[in-house]
């Protein structure tokens, strides 16, 4: 079993806290952090080295760029970083664009916590 260090990038504090609480009972999660200021992203990646970044698509409250563009920037600077798109907008174009830029998956925000853990564990296994 892999212990997973997760970073959530989302502009909704209530969702971030809810996901943190929902995942807190799972032994697979070593750390769960969230940021709502994208200017902290580079420093966080360098200092904490998250295993997986869960990236919302719609970040209009914290960034002029959407999550796909931020994911693309992250992956160009940190090609080994695992990024998973997490969004309530389950559109095929987001899934295909995510694959094109190298994200490890797309997860709808309506997912059950145990299913999310299963997906993240599979991503960690390669």
Segments the model singles out, each with a brief description of its role:
Residues 13-33:
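Two-component/phosphorelay signaling modules centered on CheY-like receiver
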Residues 65-79:
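Short amphipathic alpha-helix used as the core "switch/output" element in two-component signaling
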Residues 104-106, 122:
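Conserved phosphoryl-transfer motifs of two-component systems
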Residues 48-54, 59:
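Active-site beta3 strand of CheY-like receiver
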Residues 93, 111-121:
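C-terminal output helix
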